[in-house]
Every structure is written in C-alpha cells, then in structure tokens.
Amino acid sequence: DNNMMKRYIIGICVCLAITLASAQTRREMGGIYHAYPKVDVKEMSQTPSGYKPFYISHYGRHGSRWMTSDERYIKVAQYFDDESNLTPMGLKVKKLIINARDNAMGHGGKLSKLGELQHKGIADRMYRNFPNIFAQGNSVQARSSVVDRCAKSMKAFIDELRHLQPSL
C-alpha cells in the first residue's frame, strides 16, 4: 500500500539522518574553527630492514590563526549589545565574548601563539624521530608563501629545528 511505502521511506531517511549526525563529535563540528588535536604517537612504524631514513619532505599549512578579520569578533559581540534580552548566563557569556574581542583586535588573520606552538611541535617530533636527518652537517631548505601567517609558521618550525640542532 502507498501509505506503508511512505512510512518505510521516511523511516529509512530518519535512520540515515541519525547515522550521519553521529558521524562527528560536538568538538569536530567546529570544522576549520577547531584547532588540530595534539596526538601523541606512542610507536612509529619501523623502517624496513636494509633501509635508512635520509630525507623528509614536509608540506605544511599555516598553524592555528585568529579569525580572518577583526570585524568578525566585533559582529559576534554586537549580538550581546541589548542586555535586556540576556539571561544571567548570557551576561557571563557577554563578558567572555567582549574579552575575546578585545584580545583579538589587531590580530585578524594572523598566526596565533597556538599556531606557532603547533609548528614547533612538528619540528620537535621530526627531530626526535629522525635525528640522523638533522645531524650536524646536514641542511634544511624551507619555503613559504608571502602570507604573514604562513611565513611565521615556517619561521617557528625552522627556529625550533635550529634550537635543537644549532648547526642547521
């Protein structure tokens, strides 16, 4: 019967929607606004017998950054302008938003401290896991686009390698 078929299709759609909705965590829903998680790899894959690592080619994106413009922080804060519409919790959130906005001013699109630490962490892990590649006498070549946050990400990476191996 036609009614039964409609119920069946609706049921399948609901089940599919529930399955898709559970495919990501609340934290992952932030998408590009969520910092990459720090992952501790306990054990790396072993180098195949008879081989020795000699080269790393690392293509990295800029680290975590402030939102693209100061205007975005201002716009979010404006939603809290009318305090008559805010609950006590809303007033607390407003203070946090205003503090975030004030801290962000002048940093729109720039690399954040977290972004710098992310690239230092990548360099540190490479150095610890492949010390022979960064041994005295070896060299590192680095290139970046002209975008400030990209150049500063590269600088953080290289600065950390130089800290670990001053002869680079």
State the predicted function of each range.
Residues 24-168:
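Non-catalytic terminal regions with compositionally biased, polar/charged low complexity
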